[in-house]
Design a protein with these regions (language model features):
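Short, conserved micro-motifs composed of acidic
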Residues: 69, 76, 105, 112, ...
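Alpha-helical segment of the N-proximal tetratricopeptide repeat
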Residues: 26-59
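Conserved structural position within tetratricopeptide repeats
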Residues: 55-58, 89-92, 128
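Start-of-helix register in tetratricopeptide repeats
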Residues: 31, 65, 99-101
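Short coil turns that delineate tetratricopeptide repeat
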Residues: 27, 61, 95-97, 131
């Protein structure tokens, strides 16, 4: 397939160049547009940059620089197949030796479409050009390890077992954080769709704000049916994400951020909890009141164990969440706090698991024995991978990658496991009619030998 794609690209370039002349004016205009596109890109306006690079390529289809810059912008917008096509064009059209950043970008694009041998080649070239110190800043050692990890998984013929939910819930927009309730009859998840409350768009990524969605299984249709009114009173005009619900559906944890709206009930992302009304099952939502949990930094993606009782009948729950309060030393970290007889202990970083990169979307089993999370700085397939750790001798064990049966070469997050039905859910970057976005998946672990399944 890779040879076929390369052949088609070469053929398309050859056909393009036959008898074609690019005027000096068009070349100059293309160069000017590339400069404008770079300014937009570095200002974080990637969508506008991508359109500008497209115009540059139209003016001069033989500009390798236009193809390269367009491919990079498309990569950041998760248009991976288009990025792959344009970066192949750039490789053919650019005759001069390139710098390390170019090789790094090409490697990332090949990695995103699972062209691992090519990705490793360009990562190696990038490391050679950039040198040891700068290569570390680009995480090239991690990226090369990821290539080796993928090849190892391929050599074992490990098949991915994740199956996407239907298009009744998955779309070209982002869906993530799937939670199953009531014997798989109810599905709750978070999405960034045009119907979001307030119709607000995030300036940073030009995507809609988050809302919580509910879908119920329809026996007649044999499919999910979204129930929009069910969540209307809980979604704000800000960011609303559901992170955890107890198995009986009576308690849950959310991440809410209204700092960018007129509501401004939060100063940043904060962790909220809810309990359901016994009569009508409505949610009573309140922020967790602890200065060491909710701070002025980002806090969210919380998960919590069931209540355990010691010999003195002290009630204890363990909550794990994500914060960027140590952003001067790392990006996002996992933190743990205990609720002991309804009082919160001081939140502390989980030093055994945190890296200099990003740890996110934890999930703790009901008994508190296993902790799952995603990281982009541990040995894995690429992007975020899902790992698990076991609580042994009063500390968390070395993280174990769930492998290619669950993870992919792109981002995999929001893992949850439901032992009563031996089913898990995950969110992954997925191809939806040529457009890559977060979709929600489920997988059956009935025949799995993972230790958390057979405990």
């Amino acid at each position: 397939m890779q040879k076929l794609c390369s052949t088609l690209v070469i053929l398309s370039i050859s056909l393009l160049t036959i008898g074609q002349k690019i005027s000096v004016l068009d070349k100059l205009t293309s160069k000017k547009l590339i400069g404008e596109g770079k300014e937009l890109f570095y200002a974080g306006r990637v969508s506008e940059a991508m359109l500008t690079f497209k115009r540059a390529k139209l003016k001069n289809p033989l500009s390798g620089e236009a193809c390269y810059q367009l491919g990079v912008a498309q990569f950041y917008l998760r248009s991976y197949y288009n990025a792959y096509e344009n970066i192949n064009n750039a490789e053919i059209l650019l005759s001069k030796k390139q710098d390390g950043e170019y090789y790094y970008d090409v490697g990332r694009i090949f990695h995103s479409v699972n062209k691992i041998d090519s990705a490793k080649l360009f990562y190696t070239l990038a490391a050679k050009e950039l040198g040891p110190r700068i290569s570390k800043d680009y995480d090239l050692d991690i990226l090369l390890e990821q290539c080796d990890f993928v090849k190892n998984q391929e050599s074992q013929n490990i098949q991915n077992i994740c199956k996407p939910f239907s298009r009744a819930v998955n779309s070209k927009y982002d869906e993530y954080g799937a939670i199953l309730l009531y014997d798989k009859k109810r599905l709750l998840f978070t999405a960034r769709q045009p119907e979001t409350t307030g119709n607000n768009i995030n300036d940073n990524d030009q995507k809609f704000f988050e809302d919580i969605y509910r879908a119920d299984w329809n026996e007649q249709l044999q499919d999910w049916k979204i129930n929009i009114p069910a969540m209307e009173e809980y979604n704000t005009e800000g960011f609303d994400a559901l992170n955890f619900i107890s198995r009986d559906g009576t308690y849950g944890l959310l991440t809410i951020n209204t700092s960018a709206t007129v509501e401004k009930s939060t100063s940043s992302s904060e962790i909220y909890e809810f309990e359901t009304d016994e009569e009508d099952s409505s949610w009573y939502i309140d922020p967790i009141r602890s200065e060491s949990i909710n701070t002025s930094y980002f806090e969210g993606a919380a998960t919590i164990s069931d209540t355990s009782f010691d010999e003195d009948e002290t009630a204890t729950q363990t909550m794990v969440f994500v914060s960027d309060r140590r952003s001067d030393k790392s990006l996002t970290d996992l933190y743990v706090a205990q609720r002991i007889d309804d009082k919160w202990s001081e939140a502390k970083p989980i030093l055994e698991l945190n890296t200099l990169g990003r740890e996110t979307t934890p999930f703790i089993t009901a008994d508190g024995r296993f902790l799952f999370f995603s990281s982009d700085a541990l040995p894995g397939m690429g992007g975020y991978d899902v790992y698990y750790s076991e609580w042994v001798n009063e500390s968390w064990s070395k993280p174990t990658n769930l492998g290619a049966s669950i993870n992919t070469v792109n981002d995999d997050t929001h893992f949850q496991y439901f032992p009563e039905i031996k089913t898990g859910t995950i969110s992954s970057i997925h191809d939806f009619d040529g457009y890559f976005s977060y979709d929600i998946f489920s997988f059956d672990l009935s025949n799995s030998d993972f230790p958390f399944v057979n405990q």
